Design a protein with these regions (language model features):
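Glycine- and charge-enriched low-complexity intrinsically disordered segments
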Residues: 38-59
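Short, surface-exposed recognition loops or helix-turn segments adjacent to catalytic cores
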Residues: 56-61, 106-109
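Short amphipathic coiled-coil heptad-repeat segments
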Residues: 102-127
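Amphipathic alpha-helical segments
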Residues: 37-42, 71-108
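A short beta-sheet element
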Residues: 5-45
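Generic structural signal for buried aliphatic residues
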Residues: 1-3
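A short glycine-rich beta-alpha junction/loop motif
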Residues: 6, 20-27, 60-84
Length: 127
């Protein structure tokens, strides 16, 4: 898992990226898999309102670029629940993200299709 200090979002990185060097805008998070599920952590860090409020209080910087200081990340309080509940929440979060991605693609295709039909209608009427 890596955290972008600029976007303030966490993501799971594929094993193909093991050993790569991170820029200063990213922080690697190591896990004790018996204690905290990675997908549950992603949900908490990216979407859970309690953690969002904590992150907002920690922001530093000027202008458009506000970042979370690395030292502040250790102070974020993560609600720990049973591992089975963490896994359920993490899987539900992953499915929600996947569904949103599919819906975004569908929306884009629908817009392209509609625009194509409308443009063709305009071209056909000009003749």
């Amino acid at each position: 898992v890596v955290i972008s200090v600029v976007t303030r979002q966490a993501a799971i990185v594929s094993k193909g990226n093991d050993g790569k060097i991170l820029t200063l805008n990213f922080i690697k998070v190591d896990f004790d898999n018996d204690f905290l599920d990675k997908k549950y952590f992603l949900y908490l860090f990216n979407s859970y309102s309690g953690v969002k409020r904590q992150k907002e209080r920690m922001l530093q910087g000027t202008g458009a670029v506000l970042k979370i200081p690395v030292k502040s990340l250790n102070d974020i309080e993560i609600p720990i629940i049973s591992m089975s509940e963490q896994v359920k929440i993490g899987e539900a979060y992953k499915k929600t993200i996947c569904l949103n991605n599919y819906l975004d693609k569908y929306k884009s295709l629908m817009e392209k299709c509609a625009n194509s039909i409308l443009e063709e209608s305009v071209r056909g009427r000009r003749r």
